[in-house]
Each structure stands twice: as C-alpha cells, then as structure tokens.
Amino acid sequence: MQSIDLRLPSTSANHSISESLEHSKSELNELSNVSESESYFDITKKLHALSTVVQRQQREIDNQKRDLCTKTKHIEELQTLLSNANIMSDGASSQNDAFAHNPSTSVSVELVRPVVGTKKHAVYATSAPKSMSLQDSLSVPSATALADVSSSLNYSRKLSSNSIKSTNAPVFGTAVKNVTGENILSASSSEENLNSNRNGDPKFRFSVSPWISSSNFNPYEASLANFQSDNCKLKSHNSLPSIRTNVRYSNSKPSTPLSPEDVDLGTYTVKNRDSWSNEVNLSASTNNLSTNTSGTLKPYSLSSSRSSSYSKGVNSAASLQSIWETMNNSNPSVIPESTSSREPAARYRKISERNAVYDWNVIIDKIIVSNDQQSSIFLQQKLKISSYDMKQNIVDSIISQIHPLMLNRFGNFLVQRCFEHGTAPQIRQMGSAMLGNMLKLATDPFGCHVVQKAIDNVTEDIKLAMMDELFLTIDVTIMHHYACHVWQKLFETQWYEYPVNVMNRVNNALRGKWHEVAVGENGSLVVQNMFENCVEKDKRECIEEIIFHLDGIARGQWGNWVVQHMVENGQGEDLKRVIDALLNRAVEFSIDQFASKVIEKAIKSGPKNFISLYLKQITNARVDRTRQPLIDIASDQYGNYLIQQIIQLGQPAEKNLVITHIKKHMVSLRGSKYGQKVAYLVEKWNSQKQVSSVINYNCNTDL
C-alpha cells in the first residue's frame, strides 16, 4: 500500500510564517522612515526586494493549505473504508457462527453488495448468478485452513489499461443461512500447486490483502470477489436502484439457459431458477479454480491504486447473462483469431482455380464501380488460361458492358485482351459496338488505346466504318492529344480487301491546313509519322505546304521538329529547298530559340557542304557595321552552341576560318556571358595547335 503522510502542519512552521510577516512589517516601517534625501532609485530597489519576499511567503502558505486539504481528504476516505471493513468482518463472523450452530439445512446464500462511499461511487451487482451445485463429499474445513487458502487465492493482478481501479473497491459480502456441513466450500489443494499455476502467467503478481489476515475472514468473499475479470467487468449506473441478488444452492443441474424475460432489472429477482444452464462450483479445488479462472481473477484488496468505481451501467438482461456465462464456464471460451488478413489470399487462391466458374458480371461491375485493378487482372488471367467455353462466357459478359469498360482506367486493358482471345464473331460484335462512339473513344485517355487495338484486329469493313466516322471530325481529332495516336495507327494500316487511300482523303480534308497541323504539339507527330509511313505521292501535298511556310514552322516550338525531320531524312530537291530556306535566314534562325535547333541539326546531320555555306552567310560583313554576324551569333544565348559545334565538327579549313574571325574580337567575347565559352574553346584549340606544331618541328629537326 502507498504510504500517506497525514501529519498536519507543525506549529513551528506557523510560527516561522508569523515571524516572516512581522519581519516584513518591520521592513515596511523602516522604509517609511527613509529620509527625504535618500534617492528614488534606492527606494524602488527596496520595494522590489520586499515584494519578492512577500510573494515567496504567499506561495509557501498556499502549498501548505493544499497539502492540508489533500491529507484531510485521505483521512475521510480511509475512515469510510475502515467502517465498511468492520461491517463485513461482523457479517463474516455472524455467518461462521450460523454455520457452526446449524449444519443440517440446505444452503441459501444471499449476496449483499455494500454501498461504498457516496451515491456517485455506488456499484451495483449486475450479473445473473447461475445455479451452483456443491459437492456432497466435502467436509467442513477449519477456520484456519479456510483463511490460509483464501489468502492464497486472493492475489493481486497487474492492472491493464482497462482494468478496474478503485480505492473504494466494492466487495460482494455474503450472508449464509442454514448452511449444511456437506455443502460447504473445501480447499484441499496445496500451496505449491497454486504457486506453480500462478507462475505460469507472467501477468500476475502476488500479495496478501490485509483483509485476509482477519480471523473473521469469510471464504465466500474471497471466491466471489475474485470472480471479477477484465473481460467481464461488473457494471454500474448512477440512476439504478440498489440490487440484492438471492442465490439458492441446489444439487439440480438445469439444462436450459436463462432467457432475458426471466430477469427483472428493477429489483433483480430471479423468476425461474430452474432455467439456469451453467454451474458455478464453489467447492472446486484450487487447481481447477486457478486453471479455469486464471485469466479472470481480480484482487480482493484495499490498495489505493484501484481508484474510482466501475464505469458503465447495465443495459439488458442478455448482457448480465453473458457475464455470468463467461465466469461460470469450466473451459473459458476462446475468441477465434481474426482471419481478415488471410481472407484475401484464400479468396484469390480459390478464384484462381483453372476451371472455377463465377458470376462474371459481378466482377465486371466491381471494375466499373470501384476501379478495382485486381478484378481486371484476374479476368485477364482467366482469358489466358481458361478453357474455350469459359473464355467465351467471360467475353460475352464483357461485351454486355463494353462501353463503360472501354473508358475505364483498368477496364480498357480487359477489352484489349478480349480482342486477342475472342472469337471472330465476338471481335466483330465488339467492333460494331464502338461505331457511333468513335469521337468519344478516340479523345479519351483510355478509350484511344482500345480503338488502336481494334484497328489491328477487326475486319476491314468495321475498320473502314471507324475511319469514316473519324473523318467527320478530322479537324478536331488529328491534333488532339489522344486521338492523334489513332490517326497515326490509320496511317500505318495496310488495306487488302478494300482499295482505300487514306492519304487522299486526309489531303482532301486538310488541304491548306497542313502548316497549322505541323505547328501543333500533336499535329507535328502526325506529320512526322506521315513522312515515315506514306508513299511520296501521298505526302507530296503536305511537303509542299510545309516548305512554303517553313519560316514560321521552323520558329515554332513543335514545328521545328518537323523541319528537323526533313533536314535529317529529306532527299533530293526537297532537301535542297529546305537548306536554301535555312541559309536565306541563317542569322535570324541562329539566334532564335527553336530555329537554332534546326540549324544545329543541319550542322550535325545535314549535307556535307552545309557548314561552308553557313559560314559564308554569317561571315559577310554588313555595310552598316564592321562587326560580323559570326560574333553576334557567338555571343548569343542560343547561337554560341552553333559556333562551338563548328569548331568541334568542322573541317580544318572551316575551323581556321571561324578562329581567325573570332581572334579579332576576343576582348568582346571574354566580356560576354555566352561568348566567353567560345573564346575559351578558341584558346584551347590554339594551345593544342601550338603544341602539335612544336612536336612536328622537333620531329623534323631530328630527321
């Protein structure tokens, strides 16, 4: 038990406080007599010091008052507990006397719950007791033996977070009437067996309550008090009346459980005693008791660590019955381990069986409604490994909901697998279902993939119908972020049964608009794809229009890639026309953010004579300025990369020409943020040239 210091504040402490107060008063008097000549600073300093002393003394007084209130409260609680202890001790003595003088009658035990403390902390008995049969072969033990065994049974248990804690711990008292010598509790087990059972559970710690040492101790109190468990907490409610529970012990063994209708919560009287099903055998040995209730025993103690009373009230008779069933079962029920973590694995193992048949529509609904990726993967695997008949059933279920699946994040993959594993009639049915929705599918981030897959698998008549529908909105779809990929797939498609010329129809639809398509982010990809996959006559009209508008296309963020493609892969007259267009605006293109990339591509991958032609254009001095365009390009944010490429990749004559012109403007280039890169490269090339010349001179002299 926690020791509590109940000493009141000593008179010496009070005397010291009074002396401090008198000392403070004297200081105030002295302060009042300060001469007028004393400085204001000294007076203020003394006032602050005095204020600090007064505050410290006031804190000491408050602390002593608080300690006094706490100790007074502890004294009142202990007095209440001691009075209740005396009442129960007197009751136990009267029970033992009654048992000793009248050993021939049947047993009737009345469980009385003494109310401890105020009404706020009152605890009521909340469990329906079961019929308890006592063994006839037991003999009356001595008072000493009962006390020893009861004290050994009444050990403490380490409290968990939800354990009952109370300094006013209620204990079921017992009033024994007409006790027989044959039906009394016996305690025959040894202390060693009990200790061995206790040591098996590390949660228990052992102590002997001071109540047990009383010579008037009643064994029934220990047994019943210990039948309080964490799992079966006895409940209370502030508004409930006092409850008295009458229990009669008999040798009968009822077979039907107690129904909620047999319990009256108002006075808690049992209407049908014969309906109690389970037994509480108070005469069980300590081994059985420790085995059957090791997880539910609670201490019978005055320890102050068990604070407050039980927390919640009783709401139904069913809850009362369940509490007593938990305590009275000889084999405590074991709560099955949760299988929630194993359910998904077991479920997927089951559904992965090769020929297992399920409601495919339910799984498809799960994909559409819940975006379930696992269901989509499962059906895709089924399409790969299942039998022919099962595949057809799955595909038929998918076709019935094909429109939402094609637009679904995970459902579109399932539809694509159906094009691979479905029969010809099913593929035709899926392709026909797409007609009338081509604009929506082609412009959808998931549907566009389904359309491309369908173009590879459907018959040409369905494919032609799809293309006809797309041509109705070619102005929108050919430059769309997703639909442009569908057009690229159409450009790559080979036609065998139908003499379809896609590019003729495309040129007719986009005549005069190719330069607009080429400068778009997605349209530029379409144009490049057409250059790679269409024959010369099909792409001629597009090429002519792009060369005519090459100035604007080369300066575009996306159009410059079209011109680069023509520079790298163009041939004959078309390439010559593109190079001439670039050289005519060489200076302007060299300092443009996007057109400079076209010039760089021409330096790296263009005709062999492009660098010489390019240098001729940028080294010609203008009439109004002595500084050559070469220096302006070398000092430009984008143009300096072009000069560096010429110094690194050009022919020796071309390199010498560039370096010769740059040396004349080294001061200007060194002062430029971007020109200094070119100046450094020129100096590096000069140093290497000097080293090589020295080596050559030495070699010649040696010879």
UniProtKB/Swiss-Prot annotation:
SUPFAM superfamilies: ARM repeat. Residues 1-29, 245-265, 284-309 are annotated as: Disordered. SMART domains: Pumilio (SM00025). Residues 1-19, 245-258 have a biased composition (Polar residues). Pfam families: PUF. Residues 331-686 form the PUM-HD domain. GO terms for biological process: meiotic cell cycle; nuclear-transcribed mRNA catabolic process, deadenylation-dependent decay; post-transcriptional regulation of gene expression. Pumilio repeats lie at residues 361-396, 397-432, 433-468, 469-504, 509-544, 545-580, 581-616, 625-660. One of its GO terms (cellular component) is cytoplasm. It comes from the Eukaryota. The keyword Magnesium does not apply. CDD domains: Pumilio. PROSITE patterns: PUM, PUM_HD. This is Meiotic coiled-coil protein 2.
